[in-house]
Amino acid sequence: MGCVKLVFFMLYVFLFQLVSSSSLPHLCPEDQALALLQFKNMFTVNPNAFHYCPDITGREIQSYPRTLSWNKSTSCCSWDGVHCDETTGQVIALDLRCSQLQGKFHSNSSLFQLSNLKRLDLSNNNFIGSLISPKFGEFSDLTHLDLSDSSFTGVIPSEISHLSKLHVLLIGDQYGLSIVPHNFEPLLKNLTQLRELNLYEVNLSSTVPSNFSSHLTTLQLSGTGLRGLLPERVFHLSDLEFLDLSYNSQLMVRFPTTKWNSSASLMKLYVHSVNIADRIPESFSHLTSLHELDMGYTNLSGPIPKPLWNLTNIESLDLRYNHLEGPIPQLPIFEKLKKLSLFRNDNLDGGLEFLSFNTQLERLDLSSNSLTGPIPSNISGLQNLECLYLSSNHLNGSIPSWIFSLPSLVELDLSNNTFSGKIQEFKSKTLSAVTLKQNKLKGRIPNSLLNQKNLQLLLLSHNNISGHISSAICNLKTLILLDLGSNNLEGTIPQCVVERNEYLSHLDLSKNRLSGTINTTFSVGNILRVISLHGNKLTGKVPRSLINCKYLALLDLGNNQLNDTFPNWLGHLSQLKILSLRSNKLHGPIKSSGNTNLFTRLQIMDLSYNGFSGNLPESILGNLQAMKKIDESTRTPEYISDPYDFYYNYLTTITTKGQDYDSVRILDSNMIINLSKNRFEGRIPSIIGDLVGLRTLNLSHNVLEGHIPASFQNLSVLESLDLSSNKISGEIPQQLASLTFLEVLNLSHNHLVGCIPKGKQFDSFGNTSYQGNDGLCGFPLSKLCGGDDQVTTPAELDQEEEEEDSPMISWQGVLVGYGCGLVIGLSVIYIMWSTQYPAWFSRMHLKLEQIVTTRMKKHKKRY
């Protein structure tokens, strides 16, 4: 019995030791736990960081603060993102990708005490411009290093090349990383075990070395400033699966004409925005494993290259922004094709019959080409289609019912064609963007569009859509852009159209037949940037709740029947750049304000065709800070920017150079003040001369008096000045002749007197610029100044100069000439015959004849 107890006791001790020995290594070393906690405390957790982060495969992973689970009471081996060696307990891997970390990454970080690390992933955090420490090169056992998209900046240290065991190196970022050009090749030379190399957006600014690791499966060098000819050896890396050289505009790529060593392995090839030498060779036909090909913006021309049609396993083909032409061939061989983009090739033509042969398509973009005819109505195999873009072609006919029946449709863009008929009910419940603008569609807005839960873009402008705007539109709580302008909609604007939507940025209901008051409540916290309601029959007052639109850049309520005084409070909208209240029934004086922060960013102010009275609003004019500067930082024209310019161009009526224009895009330099057709009185404030960026000034058809301010000479970029039909008196300031950009001038029907300035632009204006001013004189008017010939027109001055240069000879000169000629002539004859030198006379005669002939030719040239 005692022996049995002894055996059980020894077995118990053995098992206890066994369990203890197997669990002890999992206890994190205290110094490493402390190092991790110190590392954690160097950063804050930003809960406003992106909720999702893309990983290297393009998939999205959810962000969350992994370090919140770290505390002293538990072993660090159990902490989120920390992995320990099962035998020794040493920390060998740290995965903190997408962990919402924010703060400076110091070069002496406690992280570098974890000397046994084999895998380190710090991607998708925010280290706010920290430098990459050379100490990363001390992790001698590291096989995986990912620092991408974490806002590192500066030069990538050469010590990274010491990590000779690296299999994966990912340091791509758009924050401003670079590698010293002569360090790139040595870096590759030492990293002979690399499988994946991603340096996207890192500034390399060098030629492409040829000493890449022969084990490479992934090489991503997009946007790195590579130049020169790509070594052909890159295409012969036998294990290569993914090659991305996109956005290197100085890189030349010449594809091998013979079979590539990588032809069996290569699955993704991206060469967007590089220079492709020669045509696509037949060797492309051997890329049997290729699934994705991006050759956009590579200057391909002619028909779609035939070798591409042999890529039977292709799933994504992107040939956008090229110069391809001719019809699109049938696609029955592309059985696996899911994404096809031929966007903006311009000269691709023919019909869409080829669509009948593909059943796997999920995304099709044929926009901005020359495709013609109707969309085939007998297509039934595109049930997987999610995105269809056919905008900016020459397509016509009705939109076939199969498009409205697509069960998984997410985005539809058929804009800028001539489609007719009605918009049918949509079957899909997943729509996020519907763009049918600029067609000939009619009928009502279908209810199925107004019941979408994820709709962000609804652009139906420039059609013949009729009926009322249903209150069901208020169900679109995710809407960002709503453009129903230039249709035949009538009735009132639903009050809830803005109230229930916190994402709405653009609201355009312009050029319809909407009536009633603007009873919409613009709620606090809205993000509206554009409100365009012009060209309707809206009445009542300007809604005071507009004061809640803190991000508003454009407000166009023109061409309505609003009856109100000037809404001076709109000046508190600090982002407002364009304000049009033209053609309403606004009235009364524009009261001055002591607040110098009103309308400071305004670039276009149109209050024309109203009933405003009193003096011009000098205090507001003095606040227009955006007009007090001329931006000479760029020579290329820039338009007032908007994050949704690609989808939407606002339509605003502006008056410049004597004409009204419906402008869809407005130059950032276009500064306009239009206060015409009102009842303003008093003098023109000289403070307008401070608005040196002004391009158009129209104060016509008011009751203004006094003189034209001499300060207008400061308006050096002014292109159009209209002060007509007022009671302005005095002379035209001579200093205005210095306005070299002035193209249109209208000072007619005033009480101006004196001489019209001469020179430069003033010599190009006609009588109509000055008519109705009986006291004016000088060119181009027939009335001369001063009552004598002292003042003449430029043409008369030229004639006088010509007459001064002509050889006019008075009668006294004629007599003197004859007398002198007679004496000299007789003397010459006497000398000639007395000296017997006729040869000498002959030579002298020839010489004189030559001189006279030359001078006569010069004289003729002057005329």
Curated annotation (Swiss-Prot):
Per the UniProt entry, the glycosylated residues are 71, 108, 190, 203, 211, 261, 299, 310, 378, 396, 416, 464, 519, 563, 674, 698, 714, 746, 767
Which UniProt key words apply to this protein? Answer: Cell membrane, Glycoprotein, Leucine-rich repeat, Membrane, Plant defense, Repeat, Signal, Transmembrane, Transmembrane helix
The ranges of region (C-cap/acidic domain) come to 760-812
Q: Give disulfide pairs as residue numbers.
A: none
Under the heading InterPro entries, the entry gives: Leu-rich_rpt, Leu-rich_rpt_typical-subtyp, LRR_dom_sf, LRR_N_plant-typ, RLP23-like
Q: Which GO terms describe its cellular component?
A: plasma membrane
Task: List GO BP terms, alphabetically.
Answer: defense response to fungus
Residues in the Cytoplasmic compartment per record: 834-863
LRR repeat residue numbers: 91-114, 115-138, 140-163, 164-190, 191-213, 214-237, 240-262, 264-286, 287-311, 312-336, 337-357, 358-382, 383-406, 408-428, 429-452, 454-476, 477-500, 502-524, 525-549, 551-572, 573-597, 599-623, 667-690, 691-714, 715-739, 741-759
**Which SMART domains does this one have?**
LRR_SD22 (SM00365), LRR_TYP (SM00369)
Q: What's the domain of life for this entry?
A: Eukaryota
Topology in the lipid bilayer is annotated as: Single-pass type I membrane protein
Q: Is Transmembrane helix a UniProt keyword of this protein?
A: yes
Q: Which residues cross the membrane?
A: 813-833
> Where does the UniProt annotation locate this protein?
Cell membrane
Q: What residue spans carry the region label N-cap?
A: 24-90
Q: Which family does it belong to?
A: Belongs to the RLP family.
What's the stated role of this polypeptide?
A: Involved in plant defense. Confers resistance to the fungal pathogen C.fulvum through recognition of the AVR9 elicitor protein.
Which protein, by its recorded name, is this? Receptor-like protein 9DC3
